[in-house]
Amino acid sequence: MRRMMAAFVALALLASPAVHAVQPDEIMSDPAKETRARDLSRELRCMVCQNQSIDDSDAPLARDLRLLVRERIAAGDSNSQVLDFLVARYGEFVLLKPRFERQTLLLWLLGPLLLTGGGLALWLQIRRRSRSGADLPAPPLTPDEEARLAALMSDEAKSS
């Protein structure tokens, strides 16, 4: 059983996209430049996979983009120059984390605004319920209701 579990784990690791994404022929000889390339690749969206970075994607376009990033780094471009080049070529969508600019202001502010609005609506609803008396205790039972309840409870106790 342990061998089977170990084989399953090994197979799962080998089949994961992150293991196969960066091919050996893509790796740069300079470790510092390779680290920069990997960091930049994690910030860029695979245009085929949509919500996966090009560092994790096996798509042919992701491979081309990884190679392009490495070419730009080898040519001496800074990280911001590489990102600017790719944004100019593919648009802002290529960035997994869009920049905070006038065009993306709504994207950045919509989440906090919705969260604040939802919290305010919840607070108002709770406040309205407490004012309307919804939290008041129920009125006491009448003698007829108490007798009926006692009869139902004794029937329940007999049947169990």
From Swiss-Prot:
Membrane-spanning parts: 104-124
Record-linked InterPro entries: CcmH/CycL/Ccl2/NrfF_N (IPR005616), CcmH/CycL/NrfF/Ccl2_sf (IPR038297)
Residues that hold heme according to the record: C46, C49
This protein's UniProt keywords: Cytochrome c-type biogenesis, Heme, Iron, Membrane, Metal-binding, Signal, Transmembrane, Transmembrane helix
Record keyword Heme present: yes
Principal subcellular localisation of the protein: membrane
GO molecular function: metal ion binding
GO BP terms in the entry: cytochrome complex assembly
Stored Pfam families: CcmH
Top-rank lineage group of the source organism: Bacteria
GO CC terms, sorted: membrane
Keyword Glycosyltransferase: no
UniProt membrane topology term: Single-pass membrane protein
Subcellular localization, as worded in the UniProt entry: Membrane
Signal peptide from the UniProt entry: 1-21
Family per record: Belongs to the CcmH/CycL/Ccl2/NrfF family.
Function description: Required for the biogenesis of c-type cytochromes. Possible subunit of a heme lyase.
Name under which the protein is recorded: Cytochrome c-type biogenesis protein CcmH
Native source organism of the sequence: Bradyrhizobium diazoefficiens (strain JCM 10833 / BCRC 13528 / IAM 13628 / NBRC 14792 / USDA 110)
Gene that this sequence comes from: ccmH
